[in-house]
């Protein structure tokens, strides 16, 4: 999935913070009504969105879409930032649509 950003509009940030997890932490299962950006600072985060599993390490980030389930699938310890936001400024594109957009 690719996203285009309309820079004339700003996202509405509803919640953001820095989190340091305890050892053997697993991210809880949830479905958000907002976009979420995770930025991993240290350690590893084992995160699943729907059927896709990701191993995030220091310097990695992931952008989660609203309405999709996400959860941890393996215990770990990490430090990360998270930003929850609502936005009308983003448009999602499936990978097969990219050639049409480029024309």
Identify what each model region corresponds to.
Residues 12-100:
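N-terminal regulatory/effector-sensing and dimerization cores
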Residues 1-12:
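A short, N-terminal "cap"/entry segment at the start of jelly-roll beta-barrel domains
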């Amino acid at each position: 999935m690719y996203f285009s950003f309309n820079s004339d509009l700003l996202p509405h940030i509803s919640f953001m913070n820095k989190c340091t997890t305890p050892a053997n932490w697993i991210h809880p299962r949830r479905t958000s009504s907002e976009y979420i950006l995770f930025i991993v600072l240290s350690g590893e985060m084992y995160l699943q969105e729907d059927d896709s599993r990701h191993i995030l390490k220091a310097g990695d980030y992931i952008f989660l879409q609203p309405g999709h389930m996400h959860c941890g699938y393996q215990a770990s310890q990490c430090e990360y930032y998270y930003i929850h936001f609502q936005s009308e400024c983003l448009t999602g594109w499936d990978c097969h649509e990219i050639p049409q957009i480029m024309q």
